[in-house]
Amino acid sequence: MKTLLFAILPLVSLYFILLVEDGRADPYYRKFTTPKQKALILGNSKAGQGIMPSILNNSLKQIYDLKIYNYSFTLFGSPYGPLYLESVKKKLEEGIKGSYFIITVDSWSISGPIENPNNISIFEENKLFLADVKLVDIDPNPFYFASHYNKSFYEILIQKIKPGKTKLHDDGWWETEDYLDSATILSRKNNMVRFYNDYNERHSFSEVRFNYLREIILLLKERGDVFLIRMPLSDEILEIENEAIQEFNKLLDGLASETGVQYKDFNENKTSFFFEDGLHLDTKSSIFFSNDLAKWISDFKSETDYKFN
């Protein structure tokens, strides 16, 4: 009996520790414990940090009577491909109609390893969490913690007692600490420039990923409005992205026309945004951008309603 008790006690303790994780100990875990959703934001970390569902929900509540959830991850974790498609399917509620979806795209989210960019078996995400997390709406979620939680479990308790400055919110938005020191910001930007120059040398456009992007668009279009967007970048990082896929906007304009959805590049006539590292918007700019995005969607819906009335 004592042996059984000692065997069960650690599991029970772990169960309750996982229940108190509130988004501060890990940037992705809570995305796999929240319920299935009616509306989603898709993309990588730019979208994860830069688009605030709370602002969209408030600004668009007269148009869409539902809440949108940020289901964006990372450059390597959620490029468009079979794993992201299947995870999105799992995260969607059944029978959704009259919803809306925001799909963020950049050159890197539709690129693959340069040796064979269309070979699914060598896609980087095969070794990351989307490959292992079979259920995306259970709390606690052992599929994620078994393979992809790399910190001590005590970190969960520490963050609960003394919270840090980063947090994954209940709506999927990843809040980060704003770096105000100019030297730190410059250093981070230089690191990003080096990283993405190197990334471009090792990756190229993937027709397979592009086709999966199309498949995701068509999947979501059956459930509501789809808005395809290119998020703003600093001039330095944007120049590198433009080198990755030339005539990117022409490619996306064609896809939007083919699938019957709206596309906008927010780098065109962009207002003055502040980037933590050249890539990710800081909190204040995330607020500004989310409002800009909401206005664009609202204006489109108003124009569409006017045409049909």
Positions of PLM-derived features:
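Active-site segments of SGNH/GDSL-like serine hydrolases
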Residues: 179, 216-241
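Hydrophobic membrane-insertion alpha-helices, especially the h-region
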Residues: 2-19
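Catalytic nucleophile-elbow at a beta strand-turn-alpha helix junction centered on a G-D-S/GDSL motif
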Residues: 37-53, 283
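Secreted/periplasmic serine-hydrolase-like ester/acetyl group-modifying domain
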Residues: 118-216, 222-223
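Alpha-helical transmembrane signal-anchor/signal-peptide segments
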Residues: 21-39
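Membrane-embedded segments
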Residues: 46-138
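C-terminal regions of proteins
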Residues: 241-309
